[in-house]
């Protein structure tokens, strides 16, 4: 990690102490073409990136950096602009049909989206935006053009990368197209700074896309510690009362008090591998049929990506495995209720094939629940193996079943790991992430100015 900018650690030359005396940006244009920060996470293309953008924008505004988020309008009823929070404006851009447009079809609408962004900017003086921060490769192409037109630096966050996803495909998943690989390579070359969630992601940018290490900054995403906590806000636990919080959450959600509850929360698609959890439960019940009467498996989320092609596929799998009686499918829920699902669970299960970070893993831990996850991407950073949860190498359902059996046989495992998880999550606040991001912005601005001066020699 030492070769990258990380958590205000060693700085690249662009962020030397002398240059840090310069001001941070006043106003940032954030781009999120394919998914709106106003959408409900857990379905369609809305997920951790939506939460990331909302939380980051609000915390940047709190340190006096205004944020305007440009996103594609998905209904005609949307107003041109919505104030998300003081200092945070969401601008809806018309580009293509409002509904029925798959993410794979969006590259054809990037010209229209860019035109809409330029129209919104046209009434402003030069320098209105100090910096462009794009999220995901589709936004990166718009950001590249906007930054050039506005004379501003470009900061880009990949969130996911085609080459990494293609190297870790789930069965039945669709490979990312070559056009995306080419596009990501161009964005990496054009960006003044690249933000990676973890040191591993930073290494992947360098290894797969020839990114300049001096331009890569590692900024761990955060968690809303006011929302995701072992006890709901306003309720103060006494010593050793975290179990009471779990019992109360189960009562609110209508879940049995003595059940083993392995929870899946997220978009239902092959990449997230909810089928691995179901297969693991089937293995567990084959070995320990007496557990059937005290296991409940909630699946909270909606179909997304290639999962949209077979929206009933997971329900049919549960029936084929003979576990439909213990699986409960629930639609995506808001953040407050999601926190309750985390509190109620014995363990959150994330068998993903690829995760740039795994935001829900930190959210669950902040709520006092351990995590059982695949040892991929950023999950080994989010989860402390053996302390705040368990990491599994590979996707063998039997390996996950063994860990679930440990939770079933050791009732103290959930509260013990859950307490450690809640403490671990405290180091992932969004305020810290926003402060570090602002530092990256300042470094990008100074680097851009030096580059412009050198060109004009």
Swiss-Prot record:
Belongs to the glycosyltransferase group 1 family. MshA subfamily. It catalyses: 1D-myo-inositol 3-phosphate + UDP-N-acetyl-alpha-D-glucosamine = 1D-myo-inositol 2-acetamido-2-deoxy-alpha-D-glucopyranoside 3-phosphate + UDP + H(+). It comes from the Bacteria. One of its GO terms (molecular function) is D-inositol-3-phosphate glycosyltransferase activity. UDP-N-acetyl-alpha-D-glucosamine binds at residues 40-41, 48, 267, 272, 333, 355, 363. Mg(2+) binds at residues 342-343, 345, 369. Homodimer. NCBIfam families: mycothiol_MshA. Induction: Transiently induced by thiol-oxidant diamide, under control of SigR. Also induced when mycothiol is oxidized or conjugated. It holds the Pfam family Glyco_trans_4_4. GO terms for biological process: mycothiol biosynthetic process. Its EC number is 2.4.1.250. Catalyzes the transfer of a N-acetyl-glucosamine moiety to 1D-myo-inositol 3-phosphate to produce 1D-myo-inositol 2-acetamido-2-deoxy-glucopyranoside 3-phosphate in the mycothiol biosynthesis pathway. Keywords: Glycosyltransferase, Magnesium, Metal-binding, Transferase. PANTHER family: D-INOSITOL 3-PHOSPHATE GLYCOSYLTRANSFERASE (PTHR12526:SF510), GLYCOSYLTRANSFERASE (PTHR12526). CDD domains: GT4_sucrose_synthase (cd03800). This is D-inositol 3-phosphate glycosyltransferase. 1D-myo-inositol 3-phosphate binds at residues 34, 45-50, 103, 136, 160, 180.
């Amino acid at each position: 990690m030492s070769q990258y900018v990380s958590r205000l650690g060693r700085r690249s030359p662009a962020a030397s102490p002398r240059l840090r005396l310069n001001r941070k940006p006043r106003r940032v244009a954030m781009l999120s073409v394919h998914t709106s920060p106003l959408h409900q996470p857990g379905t369609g293309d809305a997920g951790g990136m939506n939460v990331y953008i909302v939380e980051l924008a609000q915390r940047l505004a709190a340190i006096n950096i205004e944020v305007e988020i440009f996103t594609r309008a998905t209904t005609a009823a949307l107003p041109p602009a919505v104030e998300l929070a003081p200092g945070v404006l969401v601008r809806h851009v018309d580009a293509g049909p409002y509904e029925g447009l798959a993410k794979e079809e969006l590259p054809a609408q990037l010209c229209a989206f860019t035109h809409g962004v330029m129209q919104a900017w046209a009434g402003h003086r030069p320098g209105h935006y100090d910096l462009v921060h794009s999220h995901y490769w589709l936004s990166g192409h718009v950001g590249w053009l906007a930054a050039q037109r506005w004379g501003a630096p470009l900061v880009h966050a990949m969130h996911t990368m085609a080459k990494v996803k293609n190297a870790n495909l789930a069965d039945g998943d669709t490979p990312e197209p070559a056009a995306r690989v080419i596009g990501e390579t161009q964005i990496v070359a054009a960006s003044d700074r690249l933000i990676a969630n973890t040191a591993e992601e930073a290494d992947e940018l360098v290894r797969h896309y020839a990114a300049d290490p001096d331009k890569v900054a590692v900024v761990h995403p955060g968690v809303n510690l006011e929302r995701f906590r072992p006890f709901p806000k306003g309720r103060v636990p006494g010593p050793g009362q975290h179990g009471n919080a779990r019992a109360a959450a189960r009562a609110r959600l209508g879940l049995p008090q003595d059940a083993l509850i392995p929870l899946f929360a997220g978009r239902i698609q092959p990449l997230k591998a909810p089928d691995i959890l179901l297969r693991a439960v089937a293995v567990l019940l084959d070995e320990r049929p007496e557990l059937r009467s005290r296991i409940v498996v909630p699946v909270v989320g909606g179909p997304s990506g290639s999962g949209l092609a077979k929206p009933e596929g997971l329900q049919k799998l549960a029936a084929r495995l003979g576990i439909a009686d213990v699986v409960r499918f629930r639609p995506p829920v808001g953040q407050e209720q999601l926190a309750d699902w985390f509190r109620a669970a014995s363990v959150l299960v994330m068998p993903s094939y690829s995760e740039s970070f795994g935001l829900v893993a930190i959210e669950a831990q902040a709520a006092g629940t351990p995590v059982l996850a695949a040892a991929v991407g950023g999950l080994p950073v989010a989860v402390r193996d053996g302390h705040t949860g368990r990491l599994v190498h590979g996707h063998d359902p039997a390996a996950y079943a063994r860990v679930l059996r440990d939770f079933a046989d050791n009732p103290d495992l959930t509260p013990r790991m859950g307490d450690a998880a809640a403490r671990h999550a405290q180091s992932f606040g969004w305020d810290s992430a926003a402060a570090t991001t602002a530092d990256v912005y300042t470094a990008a601005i100074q680097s851009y100015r030096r580059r412009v001066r050198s060109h004009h020699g």
